[in-house]
Amino acid sequence: MKLEMALSIALALAVVSWTQEFFPKEAQTLNWSKFSGFWYIIAIATDTQGFLPARDKRKLGASVVKVHKTGQLRVVIAFSRPRGCQSREVTLKKDRKRPVFRNTLKGVKGFHVLSTDYTYGLVYLRLGRGGSNYKSLLLFNRQNISSFLSLREFLDTCHILQLTKQATILPKDDSCAHTILP
């Protein structure tokens, strides 16, 4: 029993340590002007129950990211939900110490670009209010199709975040995504 507990603690510490090394500590090098614009959401992994509709009703998501003011982003996200296509807009403020944007009043605990080459983006989104916390990993792409390498990175990151079972590649139907075209 004690050995199992010790092994569990050691494994948890190793995962936390490796996760901190995997994720960039600073996004200062990210060019937000280049990252800004329209993105298709090609894939999602989330621990939010009931977020996506039934498989036959799923569609590509979309996001528009804009630099609002210095240290602020305006983000619009559209998704096919159980009640149809829905979009939300929120203004996020950059954290002073961490490379993450947030708006806790609107339930956004973190919007963090984990990696990008400006044709794709891997975005870690943390939501929550009260005692509820949810994490999502989004694969952004400028086109409605993804490269093998960005999809592989998405799936590897899902594994690290323990979201592999929830990973979903969205079908190419972009009718919901086009509702927020700038």
Curated annotation (Swiss-Prot):
Cellular compartments annotated: Secreted
Major localization class: secreted
Function according to Swiss-Prot or TrEMBL: May play a role in male fertility. May act as a retinoid carrier protein within the epididymis.
Domain of life: Eukaryota
Single GO biological process annotation from the record: response to stress
Glycosylated residues (UniProt): N31, N144
UniProt similarity note: Belongs to the calycin superfamily. Lipocalin family.
Positions bearing N6-acetyllysine: K165
Keyword Disulfide bond: yes
Tissue: Expressed in epididymis.
Disulfide pattern: C85-C176
UniProt entry tagged with the keyword Secreted: yes
Pfam families, A to Z: Lipocalin
Gene3D superfamilies according to UniProt: 2.40.128.20
Any one cellular-component term (Gene Ontology): extracellular region
Key words, A-Z: Acetylation, Disulfide bond, Glycoprotein, Secreted, Signal, Transport
Signal peptide bounds: 1-19
GO molecular function: small molecule binding
UniProt organism field: Mus musculus (Mouse)
Protein name: Epididymal-specific lipocalin-10
